[in-house]
């Protein structure tokens, strides 16, 4: 419900401020490219810090997560400590985001909901820029302080101040000229859920999102190229559950996504870079004859006109098609022992990308004033060219196989035991590359007595083909414990205290996203084509190409290792747990971070030193959350949520040279 209340096209932005320990950083406002970077409990490595994303029990990319429609989602959970993430072993060091999508429930009639959201997007903050006159005064003071001849005479300063000659002495606020104050965003969604025949449950969702651009002059851009800057996305999801027998449940999930991005030939970030660094006096937007300006009496032309970049530099189109399917079956094995079940997942995902860029230069002229006869003087700066076309296409394929044994049983009404044994394998291929492969075995066992004492142990044994044969697998254990003090009979508490729980965990996890190239343990050789890469043979010496060692392999390269600890408590107060408070203190020591050695001197003669796992980072902090939820009556409730996360890291070792 909270996610749906945020009118954003990208799910990562909807999570801002919603979950304690999750930090979101948005760095772009480009339509369709405005995803936030996600960090769980700060940054524990100077390598890759992206968390693992799991959707409906299966690992997915963060892009899949970003482009989910909030109306499809039942819940989002963050796994932060080692105990909760160690099942993911080699991929769990940066934390895990677990998403559960909605499913059908038994009901007499289908439930149909239709949602429409209209939103206005606007920049949070833009730089305040100098005017040409303020800039001229700044330069005058600088010249005076340096004892230099002032570059602007009093007469020129008056012209700049009065704006009497805007072509030779322009004053352009490029942010106002290029950016709109706001843009529109539209979202439409329809959900249908229900059941049939007493055995079938279904959830079907479809949505459409459109984001407009913050760039001005789109009428000119559309007139020039017949396209409109935008981001369109269509989402589809179908989750079906079938009780084939009283013992067998089958799930069939299908999901798809179609995306289209269109924009000016110059990248959106480049447009921002241009208008941020462009001087207000660099050039007028237009010359007196209506051509694009390229210089002024104050600055020689050396940069392209921002208006031309937005409207006449070409355009790009990017199409993304994603289709995924999951088939799973769960069978109860009560005939072996009560509470035992087996479950198998098979998932397939296909991603197709097509990017087309059509670029061209445009006409612009430097207006240099008038000659003695009163004729305008123009000097060409850039000349319009034909559109050049660049196409790129690539395909990604994911397959995932997961087999699980689950056990959940309560003995004597007070002893509850749950356990899981899991084996999985993931293959990801891109175009003609050799596939990336992961596989492993994980297990979990949890025990609680009378919902007062909790113990849990997890073990992960996972590996990746990216590492040397003898270093591909790692062992990742963890454990956790909890104690509900408020349920103890020997502790007397006021009636308004509903819950006091202490908890702690410790364990190790890994991170295989170490950066660098694939298979760093392999030494590579390339043919030599220069005098340094040839050999002389024969009576009459002939040059024969040899091979150079282009990359030195590191046969000890491995994943990052993280030791994590966490202690905290939960507190609930008043009737219906109206006030809830949680507090956690966490710490992490990350080792084996891939680092380029800095302590190998040049005189050794090795210019391409193999990276090695020598980096170390320490990260620790606290997080707290205070929630208030009070239902006044059936139509009115009050909700408030206050969160705080503080994380501080320290680089302990970066393989730097010793001074």
Stretch-by-stretch model annotation:
Residues 145-151, 164, 284-291, 302-304, ...:
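Extracytoplasmic gating/loop element in the C-terminal half of outer-membrane beta-barrel translocons
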Residues 1-236, 250, 638-640:
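Short, small/polar-rich motifs associated with maturation and membrane association
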Residues 265, 288, 392-395:
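Compositionally biased, intrinsically disordered linkers/stalks adjacent to structured regions
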Residues 272-274:
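Short, compositionally biased small/polar motifs
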Residues 59, 149, 292-293, 376:
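Short, solvent-exposed loop/turn motifs
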Residues 124-125, 207, 354-365:
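Short, solvent-exposed beta-strand-terminating loops
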